[in-house]
Every structure is written in C-alpha cells, then in structure tokens.
C-alpha cells in the first residue's frame, strides 16, 4: 500500500516476485561495495527503512542481513533499527529480525483516529499496533521508537491527545513528532488528500505544543525540535554529554560522519559531501546490473558548508551557538561566523 501523506520515494507491490528481484540487486550493489571500500571497515549502525522492510518474509530477512554483514562486519556496539508496519508483520518476521540482531523497532503511527487514518489512506488500528508491540517486547526488543504526525487532515487537539495517550501506553523509549508537509507538487499521491480538511497554522501549533507537554509530563526528555526520549536512552545521554547529532532522518547519538545508503533513491553521507542513488527503481536496477554504482547526483561540501552545517546542527541540537566551541573544532575558520553570531545575539 502507498500512504497518501508520505512524500518519500516508495513503490507498491502485490506479489513477492519483484521484492525477491530487488534483494538480488541489493546483493549485487553490495558486491560492488566489497570491491571498492577499504578493508577493515566495521558497521556501527544499520537501519532498514524507506517504506516497510516487513514486507520481507523471514528467509529474505536472513538473506539480506547476511549479505550486508558479509561486506560490513558489525562493530561491538552495533545497533540495528528497523521500520515496522504493524499491519504487515507477524511473530515469525519479528523473530527473524531479532535473530539478525535488531535492537530497535520504529513504528510509524501518525494518528490512531480512524477518521484521520481514512483521510490519509492508512488503516492501522490500535489493537493491531498493540499486538505488534507486545510481540516485539516478547521477542526481546528492548528499544521502541514511535513516529507521530500533527497537521493531518481532520486532525484535532482531542484526537491527537487520544492518540498520544494510546502511544504512551506502549512505554516507548523514543517518540518523533513531525509536522505534516503538504507538497502535492512534489508527491502526487498527496493530491488524494482533501486540502480543506487540513488544520490551519494555529491549530497545528496548538497540537504540537500540547503534544510536547503530554510527553514531558510522562517523563520523556525533549530532544531538539521534534523528538522525545526516556531518561537513560542513548538520545537522552547524547543530549547531556554534547554528542547529539541531527541527520536527514532525525536526531541520533551516532557521531560517525560516514553513512552508506543502499537501494533506489538512497542517500549516502561522507565527510566531503553527499551522493544519491537513482530515485527510479528501474534506473537503479539497470545501473547495478551493468556493473556500476547507481549514483545519480551528489554534492561536494566546501569548508564553509561544513562549518555552517555544524553551526546549524548545534542550534538544532542545543538551541545555542558558542564561538569558542566552534573554534575548538574548526580553528581560525570559525571566525567566519562571527558576523552571524553577532546578528543573532
């Protein structure tokens, strides 16, 4: 299924055949990686997302995990997070993911109200989600992340408060609270959403602030602009120790500057810049089958880009900028931001 509110690159399928073929292409891309990367690299984090990895049956879960580990052996402090669709997972899939080392499950909830769910093309009953959470806990998955969205069609303060009460009953370790971005010119499926049912700016603000209060009252620590974490979670620890980071997926405790993306439309981050694979699945497969990487565009960061990116990250993580801190990291180059700091002081 394709949820109407999502602006990410996804593709629906009703049979397993294209999924199996896609796994073969991922294996081919990994083989190209093996022949290119330096020896001795170890993987600290692994994330399966970009739709729902739980479309994979257990045998393909094992197959993909082993293919990745054959190229990128796991670090001692390895973390493995997986996006879970409660309507497309069962205990056998959860057990397979747990056997492959999954440490964190991430469940996209958005809103539990059936009126809101119908308006965004995503049916996900609370009872089904609770059963999924129970299975995850029973399988030994100790870290649970939930994603909520405010600003959805027909969403009201009462409805989002009811959703949050249900989410808190799961005792999540992390919560991400994102604002819905209505961009139908970028994501054609969003044209299925009734624009007249979208909350106005003041209603969005009221929902966001009320949600933040409810999470804080439940004992979760506010993390940056849109995340919350239980005390003792690695995000909470990273915030307190100055190690919190922000990437294009959200907040993270991972300070590594290298992120390697696999698959169609995936984005890789390196100390020197970014690279993205071909967004179209057919184009991605064609490039990999030709024995070449599928990169379609990239961006090389200048020294000033890196400095400004770090300054923005510090603001998003800590809500403050310290020139001395930037000088300790960048040396004399940090002085280039002095006019900016003076302007916002």
Where are these regions (language model features)?
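C-terminal scaffold of the Radical SAM
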Residues: 10-36, 41-332
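C-terminal extensions of enzymes
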Residues: 327, 344-345
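Short amphipathic alpha-helical interaction segments
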Residues: 332-343
